Curated annotation (Swiss-Prot):
Catalytic activity, EC: 6.1.1.17
Organism from which the protein derives: Rhodospirillum rubrum (strain ATCC 11170 / ATH 1.1.1 / DSM 467 / LMG 4362 / NCIMB 8255 / S1)
Keywords: Aminoacyl-tRNA synthetase, ATP-binding, Cytoplasm, Ligase, Nucleotide-binding, Protein biosynthesis
Function: Catalyzes the attachment of glutamate to tRNA(Glu) in a two-step reaction: glutamate is first activated by ATP to form Glu-AMP and then transferred to the acceptor end of tRNA(Glu).
Spans through the membrane: none
Protein name according to UniProt: Glutamate--tRNA ligase 2
Length: 468
């Protein structure tokens, strides 16, 4: 058997973090078994579904590296096929037309509430003769669900879960306007797409009982269900925007690497021993449904940020530079020339050790490519007082024709200057840092001098020395 999984979002908004994890679990399971991962857009809500949301879902999945194996299926386009399945059930006596009016259904529910019963359809038209159909009333089609016994789901995560059949009413398959319901559409699409494993949030667990009964009625094999626990905030409350319930594009904009987010998401509910950091290839190799826990996972932005920092330190400098340049160009409003790319690449080793996100990296790296004269922040201004500018003037004199231009020799020069002045090295280094970076925080300043080279270094020193 070829394993086939699917991710089936509704295009009514962004690809939120819970949906991204569901997609990831489906993708990992399919890849682990050498199977297929399919994408279905459940766009039956024509009012709320938008092309922009569809594009955002595609973009989010692509950014996360979750590739799908066939052209996406759009559920609304298959409405005729869904209706066909419902009419087949009517022809077989396994579904029926219900002519209850909205007022009758309301009265039915109120009567049940008055008796302390859960409100649900009472099967009024289940066994009535079609000849009794009232004129001018468009019917719905309902499934003739089993009334006795139990329906049991053997869930790969939740275990065996059972419901008494008398707790489920005859659900609607086709509305009175002929449009299919979610329950019908999902079952028909999963069957026609050859889905073998349905991996989704455990908020769908109650749906699985009704869908199982529909599979039975249609004579189709039921897929394996795996209902995964939802994600909560770090405080244990339902995940919300304040916890980080944002779209995938928001995490990209906040400077997270897709591989770091994949690593973090797969650990929300799934474990492989004590391993915390692992490659996507390892996750594919190790992933199993049996290793998914039943308890809700807690999303912790601080842990994600720390993990992202770990990934950044291990990421190739060329790739980080390629990711950084467009971000800096957008932030600074300039085109960075090839020479600027080279500066960023040369300084990357010292920069990435101090940043946990690409946003932080951009803030740290901006001084390399800012136009002269550099803007000096308020704290750095204090290092460029009269004494600081005097130090810079002396340094400029010593740097003319200085050789070799290496971080070690430059540091030795600064040490000699500090000894001559009877001050600590930091007293000399701070005005240099302020002049070259516009800040009091940077990579090692003599490394910065080496990377900037003599011309740019001297130009910035002179700018700051004459700064008032």
């Amino acid at each position: 058997m070829t394993v086939v999984t699917r991710f089936a979002p509704s295009p009514t908004g962004f690809l939120h973090i819970g949906g991204a994890r569901t997609a990831l679990f489906n993708w990992l399971f399919a890849r682990h078994h050498g199977g297929r991962f399919l994408l279905r857009i459940e766009d039956t809500d024509r009012v709320r579904s938008t092309p922009e949301a569809v594009a955002a879902i595609f973009d989010g999945l692509e950014w996360l590296g979750l590739d799908w194996d066939e052209e996406p299926t759009f559920q609304f386009a298959r409405a005729a096929r869904h209706a066909e399945a419902a009419h087949e059930l009517v022809a077989k006596g396994l579904a029926y037309r219900c002519y209850c009016t909205p007022d009758e259904l309301t009265a039915m529910r109120e009567e049940q509430k008055a008796k302390g019963l859960p409100p649900r359809y009472n099967g009024l038209w289940r066994d009535r003769d079609p000849s009794e159909a009232p004129a001018g009333v468009a019917p719905v089609i309902r499934l003739k669900a089993p009334q006795d016994g139990e329906t049991t789901i053997t869930d790969s995560v939740q275990g065996a879960v059972t419901v008494a059949n008398n707790q489920l009413d005859d659900m609607i398959l086709l509305r009175s306007d002929g449009t299919p319901t979610y329950m019908l559409s999902v079952v028909v699409d999963d069957h026609d797409m050859g889905v073998t494993h349905v991996i989704r949030g455990d908020d769908h667990l109650t749906n699985a009982f009704r869908q199982t009964q529909l599979y039975w009625a249609l004579g189709w094999e039921t897929p394996v269900f795996a209902h995964i626990p939802l994600i909560h905030g770090a405080d244990g409350a339902k995940l919300s925007k304040r916890h980080g319930a944002l779209g995938a594009e928001a995490y990209r904009d906040m400077g997270f690497l897709p591989e770091a987010l994949r690593n973090y998401l797969v650990r929300l509910g799934w474990a492989h021993g004590d391993d915390e950091v692992f490659t996507t290839e390892q996750a594919v190799e190790w992933f199993s449904l049996e290793s998914i826990g039943r308890s809700p996972s807690r999303f912790d932005m601080q842990k994600l940020t720390a993990l992202n920092g770990s990934y950044m330190r291990e990421t190739d400098d060329d790739r980080l530079t390629a990711l950084l340049v467009p971000r800096l160009e957008s932030t600074l409003g300039l085109d960075i020339p090839a020479a600027g790319h080279a500066l960023l690449r040369a300084g990357m080793a010292g920069l990435k050790e101090r940043a946990k996100t690409l946003v932080e990296l951009a803030d740290l790296a901006a001084f390399y490519v800012r136009p002269r004269p550099l803007a000096i922040d308020a704290k750095a201004e204090k290092a460029l007082d009269d004494e600081g500018r005097t130090i810079l003037a002396a340094l400029i004199d010593k740097l003319d024709d200085f050789s070799p231009w290496t971080r070690d020799s430059l540091e030795n020069l600064a040490r000699v200057m500090s000894e001559e002045r009877g001050v600590k090295l930091g007293k000399v280094a701070q005005p240099i840092r302020a002049a070259l970076t516009g800040s009091t925080v940077s990579p090692p300043i003599f490394e910065v001098m080496e990377i900037l080279g003599p011309d740019e270094t001297l130009g910035r020193l002179r700018d700051a020395q004459s700064h008032s």
